[in-house]
Design a protein with these regions (language model features):
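Low-acidity, Ser/Thr- and Arg-rich intrinsically disordered low-complexity segments
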Residues: 2-4, 10
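Active-site-adjacent structural elements in enzyme catalytic cores
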Residues: 13-172
């Protein structure tokens, strides 16, 4: 995957645009850059563009989960097809009921214990939602990252389709 700009290994970055659009790197470990980085990330998501954002496990490529074009761009950036739909990051447990239906009590107990954190749950997607994540077979993979910057961004943008910032088959 080609990217414009350079990455730093030591600090989370928001946003980092992949492809030929533009390269903007904000070091969100520097408090003077957080507001600018968040503003740029929100704007990029609003335009249907991809960003690279920190999560609690790896950097992720993220897109508006409700924008079919943005989700297709995310899947293409990963070198995948819609046969492998991306998980969706959420800002809080309350979003579980907004995006899923018929959530088993066992899943509710798991998210109560392990969210925020590196737990992804696959649950029945709410049938009334107007989104296209790919071949989900009526399910959605949801995760609430344990990263303050990610959660702040998710609170402002809403759910984001997100996958690790690497090509499929390559290390993150």
């Amino acid at each position: 995957m080609k990217s414009s700009g350079t990455a730093t290994q030591s600090a989370p970055c928001l946003p980092r645009y992949y492809g030929e659009v533009m390269g903007v790197l904000s070091d969100c470990s520097d408090s003077s850059e957080v507001l600018t980085g968040m503003r740029l990330a929100r704007a990029a998501i609003g335009r249907g563009e991809l960003i690279v954002m920190p999560t609690d496990t790896v950097y992720g490529i993220a897109a508006d989960a409700f924008s079919p074009d943005a989700v297709r761009a995310l899947v293409a950036a990963k070198g995948r097809t819609l046969a492998a739909p991306p998980p969706v990051l959420v800002p809080g447990i309350q979003t579980l009921d907004a995006l899923a239906e018929n959530v088993p009590d066992a899943v509710r107990a798991l998210v109560a214990e392990f969210w925020p954190g590196p737990l992804t749950v696959i649950v029945p997607a709410r049938s009334s939602l107007n989104w296209d994540l790919g071949e989900t077979r009526g399910t959605v993979a949801l995760r609430m990252p344990d990263d303050q910057i990610a959660l702040e961004l998710l609170n402002e943008t809403g759910p984001l389709a997100c996958s690790s910032a690497n090509l499929t088959g390559q290390p993150p």
